[in-house]
Amino acid sequence: MSVIYLDNNATTKVDPEVVEAIMPYLTDYYGNPSSMHTFGGQLGKAVRTAREQVAALLGADESEIVFTSCGTEGDNAAIRAALLAQPEKRHIITTQVEHPAVLNVCKQLETQGYTVTYLSVNGHGQLDLDELEASLTGNTALVTIMYANNETGTVFPIEEIGKRVKERGAIFHVDAVQAVGKIPLNMKTSTIDMLTISGHKIHAPKGIGALYVRRGVRFRPLLIGGHQERGRRAGTENVPGIVGLGKAAELELIHIETAIKKETRLRDRLEQTLLAKIPDCEVNGDVTQRLPNTTNIGFKYIEGEAILLSLNKYGICASSGSACTSGSLEPSHVLRAMGLPYTTLHGSIRFSLCRYTTEAQIDRVIEVMPEIVERLRALSPFKNDEAGWLQAQEQTLAHR
């Protein structure tokens, strides 16, 4: 049975061209890029090329790219660097729907005397810019907001947010882990000060990422040690990973326009057909301002985990939320922040596509989903009894 992988917001397949680019740096070119000898110099050149490739994808200067190990490190580094550079300011603004790499850092900072404002979202997952405006003060050191939500695909009005942030003199950090490669970016014309990306979301290996730091932004490094990355991130460079990220960035820039069109078409077909064939289901999130590859659909009166297990029997991989919170018994914090009823958020499934997704794969999901939902609803003692279903959920949670 072949795998139908529709969980690309969790991670992606490494592109074969990326694998080919990496292999020599795992076997033949194994020196240290900081070494003075020719062997080390060859690796230094490879790192510089990769930096240029990543910069081109972001519309940035290569001097503004700092290689990291992942998106989580990038988020941590950006947040803490901004605060270390402005010790007199003790206020942070973020949203209720951020990735744990941002939310949990902010929660920890609250225990260290910082005040954090968590902006709310509406039923479509969008921010109220007036709430942002009212929250900004002279004491605000940092505003950290994701470009696009990893669970719903909702895209925030980043440049409008950035204009308001800059008017108040705060640093603006954006987690663009889900947006890069799906939305064209140009840091040269952007209001963003720092931006995080992660390799494994754009068909590069796991364990490599990058942080964009605008020239002139005060930056205090998270990792202290050697001189690597111009003193902004200590530690011997992961050359195979960096080369892989560079090649992946080059390929994303080549494919981005065709990928956006293809993924949008396949996503819309999947979404519209399921909504037409299956009663009591709805799309979660903004249906206009969103990523081209992502749909999050709530199937009422059944559990998302049961849907995923049923899909898995057909070799179909999807998600009920962020892979970084999948071990939690609680429903998605993103969908809860949107105020969705429990009958919807407990049965919500995210399908996330990529440039490798095919028509035949979408056809297969469309074929099996109606039967899965019908069977699971038939097994439910409450079916479409919303009050009874909610009571059963509360009792289940109380005994866990």
Curated annotation (Swiss-Prot):
Catalytic reaction equation(s): (sulfur carrier)-H + L-cysteine = (sulfur carrier)-SH + L-alanine
Coiled coil: none
Residues reported in the UniProt entry to bind [2Fe-2S] cluster: 324
Entry EC no(s): 2.8.1.7
Entry GO MF terms: cysteine desulfurase activity; iron-sulfur cluster binding; metal ion binding; pyridoxal phosphate binding
Positions annotated to bind pyridoxal 5'-phosphate: 71-72, 150, 178, 198-200, 236
Cofactor(s) needed for function: pyridoxal 5'-phosphate
Protein's GO biological process: amino acid metabolic process; nitrogen fixation
Cited InterPro entries: Aminotrans_V_dom, Aminotrans_V_PyrdxlP_BS, Cys_deSase_NifS_bac/arc, Cysteine_dSase, PyrdxlP-dep_Trfase, PyrdxlP-dep_Trfase_major, PyrdxlP-dep_Trfase_small
Function: Catalyzes the removal of elemental sulfur atoms from cysteine to produce alanine. Seems to participate in the biosynthesis of the nitrogenase metalloclusters by providing the inorganic sulfur required for the Fe-S core formation.
Family membership noted in the UniProt record: Belongs to the class-V pyridoxal-phosphate-dependent aminotransferase family. NifS/IscS subfamily.
Summary of subunit composition and partner proteins: Homodimer.
PANTHER family cross-referenced by the UniProt entry: CYSTEINE DESULFURASE, CYSTEINE DESULFURYLASE FAMILY MEMBER
Entry protein name: Cysteine desulfurase 1
